[in-house]
Amino acid sequence: MKNFQDKIKKLVPEMRRVNQIHFIGIGGAGMSGIAEVLLNEGYQISGSDIAEGPVTKRLAEAGAKVFIGHQAENVAGASVVVASSAIDDSNPEVRAAKEARIPVIQRAQMLAEIMRFRHGIAVAGTHGKTTTTAMISMIYTEAKLDPTFVNGGLVKSAGKNAHLGASRYLIAEADESDASFLHLQPMVSVVTNIEPDHMDTYGGDFEQMKATYVKFLRNLPFYGLAVMCADDETVMEIAPQVGRQVLTYGFSEKADYRIEDYQQTGFQGHYTVVCPNGERIDVLLNVPGKHNALNATAALAVAKEEGIANEAILAALADFQGAGRRFDQLGSFIRPNGKVMLVDDYGHHPTEVDVTIKAARSGWENKRVVMIFQPHRYSRTRDLFDDFVQVLSQVDALIMLEVYAAGEAPIVGADSKALCRSIRNLGKVDPILVSDTDQLGEVLDQIIQDGDLILAQGAGSVSRISRGLAESWKA
């Protein structure tokens, strides 16, 4: 391990006067990834979170000092404190650090420091960035380039969401939710799409959000590369403002890397990419949906422009196991009314839910789609209420869970009852509101039919609930 750390230090200068780094919210996907990379670089890592889980256990086993609960004394000995976006100035550890004159920085500022002496590839966008980051990471790994990667979700092929590589490459998911991606200084940036989300960060102004993406892309050096989705109207609107080399990808005839002849069979997608030089590349993709073909083509475009051979690109995509909680098959189960398939998916924005439903319809044409949906945040439910009503009305049967608040106070008219009422009034599906999740299995058994595909959809506790359901069904 020491020889590996010495190799890294030759590649990347160490942060002087920094010995111990403390993470508040260390169990979060993005925070844990950075902590793991820095731990493997040889820094002392400590951190706290409100609850113990698999991530905190793994970090503790790797050598991090992990505290459960936030206490002022937890920051003792820290050279710098990294706080997740969910942590505010009232946190006792933040207050203690500031009183002790210990620097308190955002997650993205630490990621930017890791990226500063590396060849950075940053993936941004409202949807698809976790999967696209994972795909690029696996392509570079397949090409024997041993990249460092920091992802916002599990890279299933690697079995983790972060890895410290011995090369100069760093592939990272860039977070627009708090505009902290502006700290990053990559060599290559990908923008998958831009839609209104996390609008509190941008004062409710979509124009401000678009301008922030332009600033992010202008962080590229003049010799950098922006890889942008030609199918997204907003992305194409800002492309002329970037002032850097831009390459596009998508189904659009105007795309530089153009997708043709997409077909889906079950979990696999088959299509052709036409490259800027006219080269045609036939792709077998091991995850379903046109949205994943877009993600994969963004990854392919980055890899081609960076000089990676087709063989490595195609092998990585054909073997890609997906990102955690992205159309994640939990299994097939025999229930009283027949055999069903249970899938867990993180999508919590109407566009994400829509593409998940479309992927299910394309790959399993003869199956009914039964959705267990848990709205995520009252503010998102309010801001995108009508879109949710339209999208959720596409399924054959709908079970609605209560809103996962994520720390927000309830908003009148933006709860699950209101969603159910509006969906019912549209007349396409009659939703069932399940407030007590202990009753979910019983309710499901009353409505499911032989051959159904059940989608557990959302970013909150619905994943834990659906996995618990799967375990009980296995028994």
UniProtKB/Swiss-Prot annotation:
Major subcellular site: cytoplasm
Q: Which GO terms describe its biological process?
A: cell division; cell wall organization; peptidoglycan biosynthetic process; regulation of cell shape
Which top EC class is named for this enzyme in its record? ligase
Top-level taxon:
Bacteria
Chain sites annotated for binding ATP: 125-131
SUPFAM superfamilies (alphabetical) = MurCD N-terminal domain, MurD-like peptide ligases, catalytic domain, MurD-like peptide ligases, peptide-binding domain
InterPro entries assigned: Mur-like_cat_sf, Mur_ligase_C, Mur_ligase_C_dom_sf, Mur_ligase_cen, Mur_ligase_N, MurCDEF_pg_biosynth, UDP-N-AcMur_Ala_ligase_MurC
Q: Copy the pathway line from the protein's UniProt record.
A: Cell wall biogenesis; peptidoglycan biosynthesis
As its record notes, the protein acts as a catalyst of: UDP-N-acetyl-alpha-D-muramate + L-alanine + ATP = UDP-N-acetyl-alpha-D-muramoyl-L-alanine + ADP + phosphate + H(+)
Q: Where in the cell is it found?
A: Cytoplasm
Q: Is Cytoplasm one of the keywords UniProt gives this record?
A: yes
Q: Return any one Pfam family short name.
A: Mur_ligase_C
> Which GO cellular component terms, listed alphabetically, does the Swiss-Prot or TrEMBL entry include?
cytoplasm
The similarity comment for this entry is:
Belongs to the MurCDEF family.
Q: What is this protein called?
A: UDP-N-acetylmuramate--L-alanine ligase
What is the species listed in this Swiss-Prot or TrEMBL entry?
A: Actinobacillus pleuropneumoniae serotype 7 (strain AP76)
